[in-house]
From Swiss-Prot:
Domain of life: Eukaryota
Originating organism: Phalaenopsis aphrodite subsp. formosana
The protein's name: Small ribosomal subunit protein uS19c
Stored InterPro entries: Ribosomal_uS19, Ribosomal_uS19_bac-type, Ribosomal_uS19_CS, Ribosomal_uS19_SF
Plastid as UniProt keyword: yes
Subcellular location: Plastid, Chloroplast
């Protein structure tokens, strides 16, 4: 179910503050965050945000096509490990 249009998009306060501060100073630096639930807003375009995937922070460059999506959508938490090619038993 999508968020109601009456409400504003969720963005963590610490993340919003850091982005506004960098926009005022016109600087670009990597912003480290654990907030995967934050929505990408237009003021984030052009910044690089390192999003936590449970193990490490993945740097993601924010573009205009990402606006409206959540940060967590761009940092996958699971990695699929393939079965060995010669292991017939586990591939059944």
């Amino acid at each position: 179910m999508t968020r109601s249009l009456k409400k504003n998009p969720f963005v963590a306060n610490h993340l919003l503050g850091r982005i506004e501060k960098l926009n005022r100073r016109e600087e670009k630096e990597i912003i480290v965050t654990w907030s995967r639930a934050s929505t990408i807003i237009p003021t984030m375009i052009g910044h690089t945000i390192a999003i936590h995937n449970g193990k490490e922070h993945l740097p993601i460059y924010i573009t205009d096509r990402m606006v409206g999506h959540k940060l967590g959508e761009f940092a996958p938490t699971l990695t699929f490990v393939r079965h060995a090619r010669n292991d017939k038993k586990s591939r059944r």
